[in-house]
Amino acid sequence: MISFASDYIAGAHPVIMQSLLETNMENLSGYGTDQYCAQAKEKIKQAFQCPDGEVFFLVGGTQTNQVIISTMLAPYEGVIAAKTGHVSVHEAGAIEYSGHKVIELEEKDGKLAAEDIKKCIEDFYSDDNHEHMVYPGMVYISFPTEYGTLYSKQELTEISNVCRNYEIPLFIDGARLGYGIESKENNLRPEEIAELCDVFYIGGTKVGALCGEAVVFPHHNTPKHFVTQIKQRGALLAKGRLLGIQFDTLFTDHLYFEISKHAIAMAERLKEVFHKKGYTFFLESPTNQQFIILENEKMKELSENVEFGFWEKYDDNHTVVRFATSWSTDESSIDQLEEYL
């Protein structure tokens, strides 16, 4: 059985595992105050050219989204997101559970448009009853989106300008940030992403780590008592070294970006195979997630030898499925897939 089910089905990249083994017997302080966390933070700030930024490490994506949104919003505020956004669909109501409404907007290929965000905010304030409503207090987007698509520099700049005009923070979910940055279609540099938003995170779980996400407040704009609020939400890891060592390794010798480049190269090869075999794409993704429309019978047949992710029902006879690549994807797996197709 070969698997393209997700980008976190394997363990950690071997270099990360080696770092964890080499440091295993060191006695280090807890809660992210160790030397490896400190080194990782400096390397991240250098990579994204935000010397005044502050970096914090959390364990997983849903936890990170909930912590960021709930600490940055007032109790009466909600977060604007695409109706297909991760916080809208695939986090079991985690944001709502923290007391904040997700204000869903229509999207195109997973992306929000600046004009739609602006209209949402303007419509809110033009309503005479807006004091009885949930205030739009943040904009959430992901890079790449749930569909693997990317915001261009112009699109992200326009969204950033709307947020700054209305003085609400822009939050970029970077669970797969490396794949977005290394995509051939990307025209945003890491430092431009940091400059245009108010908070973002660098995904480790889906980009080679065992677990872990690095939250970055690039403009010295961390919420008050942020570490205390992380602790209050049960998200402060006592053995913070686990995260620090991994991110220190990921941001040594460009490993994070090399991992991402490899996954993109494998995804390009995957696309070639599906095109060669005459399959239809649900949309053209420039990153490591590829969405294919399969006949239901073919899907059933293929699933006997290949693992992939269900995405959505296309019609009565077809289903959209997802194939994802990662650091562990190799040429031989794609060769096998080609035979099964």
Q: Where are these predicted regions, by residue range?
A:
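Conserved N-terminal alpha-helix of the aminotransferase class I/II PLP-enzyme fold
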Residues: 13-61, 83-84, 88, 94
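Conserved core of the PLP fold type I
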Residues: 54-73, 103-110
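Conserved PLP-anchoring active-site segment centered on the Schiff-base-forming lysine
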Residues: 71-89, 118
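Conserved C-terminal alpha-helix-loop-beta "cap" of PLP-dependent enzymes
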Residues: 74-78, 268-269, 273-341
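PLP-dependent aminotransferase-class I/II
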Residues: 99-137, 141-144, 151-158
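Active-site C-terminal subdomain of aminotransferase-like
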Residues: 108, 135-136, 142, 150, ...
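Catalytic PLP-binding core of fold-type I/II PLP enzymes
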Residues: 151-183
